[in-house]
Amino acid sequence: MKPMTDTSEKGLEALIVRDLVASGYVQGHATDYHRDVALDVTQLLAFLRATQPKVVETLNLDADGIPRTQFLHRLQGEITKRGVVDVLRKGVGHGPVHVDLYKLLPTPGNVAAAEAFGKNIFSVTRQLRYSNDESQRALDMVIFINGLPVLTFELKNSLTKQTVADAVVQYQTDRNPGELLFQLGRCIAHMAVDDAEVRFCTHLNGKTSWFLPFNQGWNSGAGNPPNPHGLKTDYLWKQVLVKESLANIIENYAQLVEEEEEDANGRKRKTRKQIFPRYHQLRTVRALLRRSRTDGVGKRYLIQHSAGSGKSNTIAWLAHQLVELKADAGQAQFDSVIVITDRRALDTQIARTIKAYDHVASIYGHSESAEELRTFLRRGKKIIVTTVQKFPFILDELGDLGDKKFALLIDEAHSSQGGKTTAKMHL
């Protein structure tokens, strides 16, 4: 028999927080949130004391005085400039020291790294009052990592005629995008949730705020499948938001990127965009990485994507993580990852995504010719993007590289993948 669940708004809030705390989160207190800098200062200082006591001493952060205030404003400014993901990944410089704000996920068997990761503080705070101007307005829930906000939530209950659509409207009409917490890059996503569906927005912009579904899909359609053990949406906090999963999103998916756009008059301008994976993208990449790790090389997989489903980012995320995939002996699973496409937009998308990862950008190459492609392969360039037309020219070269292992990501959703060229790639 399906268990009874309190799905009122407050009941859903309590349920999510209870499950997150059971999985290792800390329950934060709304009073620890400093609105002027949009930080949970209590959790931030707890992390710094546990991981970098000398930094705390050098910067005089234990005392509630001018040095601490200067550091908090420095950190707030860096998040404004670089986005929360980059600040978590790379930390900040302040005065004579570098301050780490996050400890990376450990590689298998790395005990020291596992211990360091365990010192991260993932916290969830209920009814967070975020505004100095409208002091009574509160978000249902906010998730922080080491005191830095990463996700906000508005929760609704369909049983009382309040649905995820109402949560979306609340974000669009009642949440001032000028508030520090809601500015672009401050959080990785803002999530509207009820007991049946999840949607998210990466950039709150009033009534034009655009929310995308974050559902599992059901019967080859939208929504979520029935859940005999609880709510349809509990995959969100039981799978996606658990510490290791959210850390993986921060490290390998979410990022603030810069794009060049052209207006109606042909003038180009640069805009910033927060990237966050949709559920099907996350599931696809993780499943392929898992299968590649267990199955080894030499297998084929077909990934079906519909138009507008974010295939370019999915390919880019998969490519950069396949490069880092390790076999049991600790050796790289693949010597190179080759992406085959004839769409310049995809090449641009991959380049932009890859370059956000400093440790990967230097090993990315785009081949303009068969000779360049041959050179990249022989020199061991890790990620190579080429066109379907050029690939057959180096099939003979691959024979000379028989001791190498390659992963091929083939974009097949366009017309040029037909005839002899495609046949050769499918050999």
Residue ranges of each PLM-predicted region?
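ATP-dependent helicase/translocase motor core
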Residues: K2-S336, A345-A361, R379-K382, Q389, ...
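Short beta-alpha junctions and helix-cap segments that line functional grooves
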Residues: L139, D335, S369-L373, L395-E397, ...
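Conserved helicase motor
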Residues: T341-R344, Y364-R374, V388-F393
